[in-house]
Swiss-Prot record:
NAD found in the keyword field: yes
HAMAP family listed in its UniProt record: MnmG_GidA (MF_00129)
Assigned protein family: Belongs to the MnmG family.
Name of protein: tRNA uridine 5-carboxymethylaminomethyl modification enzyme MnmG
Organism: Paramagnetospirillum magneticum (strain ATCC 700264 / AMB-1) (Magnetospirillum magneticum)
């Protein structure tokens, strides 16, 4: 066992710190860095230091809604955006032809570069130490976590623990009829922590995920395949990255065939998901290829993206054919795919089952309701995806550090960020399948865009203590540019006749319009307006992009701001954790049971529980208001 910066822990020795983070995947790295940025003495515990920041499944960051999460993590001074900017080998803005609210940045990553860049970022973080070892138990005293017991018998005393174990909790790999315990291929599972969580009274369940085979790119017939190039120039994730310097590569595109599907159908009884070997639920929106063939029986082809895993790595990730079929079936199946007829399989795909905690057992701070100082983040909360995990990790790590300092947690709501939407969904509704983020989950997505995440969150992060001076200074420069740009756009005005003489087709209604007003016209952007007012050429880069979006959607944004004010009135009405729902006579038994199970923290959270009717919300509101009134009036003398 090694501990950087603190020296070496000896067996049976007890050491101490403020926050211990268990697991160094995407959630753990962000949790540890956030706690350390706040100033907490933090230890990041992992079985193997060389796997810190490992991309266990696909070699990509971002995507629809996920890209917004990465921008939000970056706005809070998290690591993921800067790390992918250093390791990305293909950048694309998805849904570029659609509105700004549903666009999403995505990047292919060089796995090794990503891992090295994450390790370097952690090594540069003050107050953070990296420890190689395995957590086996928790020390819980008087309902509060007090330390972590390691496999060698040593103990780390601490004020808070963040568990970010991914798929390691009682992980079980399935490859056809074969099964073996593992956290992922090559790593042992975590058994003791599952038992510790059960002893602490946390409700555990099982979920499943999977990954495809890995291919040798030197044996792929690339010339016969379509190519997918990245954007040129590539758009960075981090607000601090000026430009991408890593060499860029293309991906290949192919598809399954009827012959592929015939092989899969002929071997379904050997597929763990269909033989009854796997009982857990997998991710609905990332199904295995055997699931696709069964659920979409009329489809003759399913698209596959062949994604290089690195600049100096011949491994290719075939995105779209995740499977746990036996290895011989996988080999036969892959040989029927165009371009892969002679392809060598480096490693077969597999499925993995693992424990998770029902996230309804958490506060919105991601602290468990039953054990003070114990925080959970990532797949342990029922989510899937690097970005979802990283976002939870940042919030859990920051709030763990704030708890140690005696400060109130930072809680983001549904109008603040996709981070707030995700956490609210989890703790209010729970999940019976791996949860992933979508733009459709966010009611206020027009405001929760990728371009303005810093405007929304960097001031909150600065106030909460997780944004450093370098990022704050850069943010203030951009904020000043936005303020000057808005003032300039609103100051430049013209009548319809004058604007028509400048070549702009405007209704002759006599209304004088500003350049800001004209941005609402779909055909008019800053470039067109700069031909009329050359001083607008001074606006460029991220400032120009954000101003153009704000101007275009100004009317819609105003209406959404009004919706948010109404939402926050409900969100501001807190519900007591010991509220007696049996005392509200007008509630049905079904609604009463749902409210008791979820114990929502606010009226708005109660309204989002499936089956809780508007009438029930009204009854709940009336009951709470009566309680407040009775309390204010006090006993009659």
């Amino acid at each position: 066992m090694r501990l950087t910066k603190y020296g070496v822990f000896h067996v049976k020795q007890t050491s101490s710190c403020d926050v211990v983070v268990i697991g160094a995947g995407h959630a753990g790295c962000e949790a540890a860095a956030a706690a350390a940025r706040f100033g907490a003495r933090t230890v990041l515990l992992t079985q193997r230091l060389e796997t810190i920041g490992e991309m266990s499944c696909n070699p990509a960051i971002g995507g629809l809604a996920k890209g917004q999460l990465v921008r939000e993590i970056d706005a809070m001074d998290g690591l993921m955006g800067r790390v992918i900017d250093r390791a990305g080998i293909q950048f694309r803005i998805l849904n570029r032809s659609k509105g700004a609210a549903v666009q999403g940045p995505r990047a292919q990553a060089d796995r090794k570069l990503y891992r090295l860049a994450m390790r370097a970022a952690l090594d540069e973080t003050e107050n953070l130490s990296l420890l190689e070892g395995s957590a086996e138990d928790l020390v819980i005293t008087d309902g509060r976590v007090a330390g972590v017991v390691l496999a060698d018998g040593s103990t780390i005393a601490c004020g808070a623990v963040v568990i970010t174990t991914g798929t390691f909790l009682r992980g079980l790999i399935h490859l056809g009829e074969k099964t073996w315990p593992a956290g992922r291929v090559g790593d042992a599972p975590s058994l003791g922590l599952s038992l510790a969580l059960e002893r602490a009274g946390l409700p555990l369940g099982r979920l499943k995920t999977g990954t495809p085979a890995r291919l040798d790119g030197r044996t792929i017939h690339w010339d016969s395949l379509d190519r997918q190039e990245g954007d040129d120039p590539p758009v960075p994730f981090s607000y601090l990255t000026e430009r991408i310097t890593t060499p860029q590569v293309a991906c290949g595109i192919t598809a399954t065939t009827p012959e592929t599907h015939a092989i899969i159908r002929a071997n379904l009884e050997r597929a763990p998901m269909y033989s009854g070997q796997i009982q857990s639920t997998g991710p609905r929106y990332c199904p295995s290829i055997e699931d696709k063939v069964v659920r979409f029986a009329d489809r003759e082809r399913h698209q596959i993206f062949l994604e290089p895993e690195g600049l100096d790595d011949h491994t290719v990730y075939p995105n779209g054919i995740s499977t746990s079929l036996p290895e011989d079936v996988q080999l036969a199946m892959i040989a029927t795919i165009p371009g892969l007829e002679q392809c060598r399989v480096i490693r077969p795909g597999y499925a993995i089952e693992y424990d998770f905690v029902d996230p309804r057992a958490l506060h919105r701070s991601l602290e468990t309701k039953g054990v003070g100082g114990l925080f959970l983040a990532g797949q342990i909360n029922g989510t899937t995806g690097y970005e979802e995990a990283a976002g939870q990790g940042l919030m859990a790590g920051l709030n763990a550090a704030r708890r140690c300092a005696g400060s109130a947690p930072l809680v983001l709501d549904r109008a603040d960020a996709y981070l707030g939407v995700m956490i609210d969904d989890l703790v209010s509704l729970g999940t019976s399948e791996p949860y992933r983020m979508f733009t459709s989950r966010a009611e206020y997505r027009l405001l929760l865009r990728a371009d303005n995440a810093d405007s929304r969150l960097t001031p909150k992060g600065r106030e909460a203590g997780c944004v450093d001076s370098e990022r704050w200074a850069a943010f203030m420069v951009k904020a000043a540019g936005l303020e000057r740009g808005r003032a300039l756009l609103q100051s430049l005005k013209g009548s319809p006749d004058w604007l028509r003489r400048q070549g702009l087709e405007i209704n002759r209604d006599g209304v004088v319009r500003s350049a800001w007003d004209l941005l609402a016209y779909p055909e008019l952007g800053l470039q067109a307006l700069a031909a009329v007012w050359p001083e607008l050429d001074s606006l460029s880069g991220a400032v120009a992009e954000q101003l153009e979006i704000e101007g275009r959607y100004a009317g819609y944004l105003d209406r959404q701001e009004a919706d948010i004010r109404a939402y926050r009135r409900e969100e501001g009405l807190a519900l007591s954790a010991d509220l007696d729902y049996d005392a509200i006579g007008s509630l049905s038994n079904e609604v009463r049971q749902k409210l008791k199970a979820a114990r929502p923290e606010t009226l708005a959270a109660a309204a989002r529980i499936p089956g809780v009717t508007p009438a029930a919300v009204t009854a709940l509101l009336g009951h709470v208001k009566k309680m407040v009134l009775d309390w204010a009036e006090g006993p009659v003398p």
